[in-house]
Amino acid sequence: MREPIISVRELSKRFGDFTAVDRISFDVARGEIFGFLGANGAGKTTAMRMLCGLSYPTSGSGTVAGYDVMREGERIKRRIGYMSQRFSLYDDLTVLENIRLYAGIYGLRRREMLRRTVTLLDRLQFRREAGTLVGSLPLGWKQKLAFSVATLHRPEVVFLDEPTGGVDPVTRRQFWELIYEAAAGGTTVFVTTHYMDEAEYCSRVSIMVDGQVRALGAPAELKRQFAAGSMDEVFRTLARGAKRTE
């Protein structure tokens, strides 16, 4: 494996008597598209929040971009991009205002901010929509804008939490083209999803069940391992014994 940009060992998160994430371990290589899969309630979002510096682990160890998830959450936040299920955009601001807001948060200098803003608007073909309120945009457009804003500062890693929920298959495929573009530029992509067909787009995937990583490998490897014709079959095999329900 190439040099890992994310490394996790026995990482756990407990809330009282409930163990949301249970001793997970894995590495993610630089430039990899890593799928973090599992049903709702499996612990994916909780694990991602720890890796993003938004929540501290109960036990275990891990690093993201060289920083300790137990002690250096604030430093991690400055080195990553993050896109939540709700796209992290402000509906009452225009497209351009959202871009400028996040450029400022990321600390981009004015000249660089202007250059990257123009590039972003051109790539998305959003020049005519620059003055449009984000709240009035179609869902698929919001999705593309949110991803582009999350990677505006060219982070080493971008974390995507269920980014394609609620959109049609064609729009999902278009969104994945943006992911491929970011990965080709050297950004590591860590994406959670419960759409098993999207696992086929990843370099490697892990599958969480009841807070634990039950499978890890390239999609083709996992399908061979479980004698399955699709990642959906792999997931169903693993999920049969799940104790958690939504």
Regions found by a protein language model. Name each.
Residues 60-71, 75-76:
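Conserved ABC transporter NBD signature motif
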Residues 158-162:
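Catalytic Walker B motif of ABC-type/P-loop ATPase nucleotide-binding domains
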Residues 100, 104, 111-129:
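Conserved ABC ATPase "signature" region
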Residues 154:
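Conserved catalytic motifs of ABC-family nucleotide-binding domains
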Residues 216-217:
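ABC ATPase "signature
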